[in-house]
Amino acid sequence: MLRTVQGFSLIELMIVVAILAIVAMVAYPSYSESVGKSRRADAKITLESYAALQERWFAQNNSYTNDIANLGGTASPEGHYTMSLFIDCDSDATADTGGTYYCFKLTATATGKQSGDRCATFTLDETGVRGYSGTGGSKDHCW
């Protein structure tokens, strides 16, 4: 009486492993891009929120604040970006000092796992002009 052997051969197992490897190679870049895109929302939401707080500050004080702590601090809520505030109304690339400020530029710089993102830095100024810098992508892609 012959016994039938049940199970998988080594060849069948290797084919399954190869198929899984191909699927992983195709899926991982899409997954990474999706995660990066969702983390970018952290920067965009924080910039928009800080800009709104700047406008509120301006309405109450007739000047924008030059202290990021008045807007919520240097870390974005989810911690993927470091926020900074730069006041340079005369465009001489040095921070303005004095009492009354009529311009501002907010910057969100990627940190930690997000630092390798192709849209690494986002900016927003008092007129609502959005900017970005990084290794690739377009303004529409990043924003």
Regions found by a protein language model. Name each.
Residues 45, 49, 124-127:
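Hydrophobic alpha-helical segments of small multi-pass membrane proteins
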Residues 37-38, 48-70:
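Alpha-helix exit/C-cap motif
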Residues 2-31:
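N-terminal single-pass transmembrane signal-anchor helix
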Residues 16, 34, 109:
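Detector for the N-terminal beta1/A-loop initiation region of ABC nucleotide-binding domains
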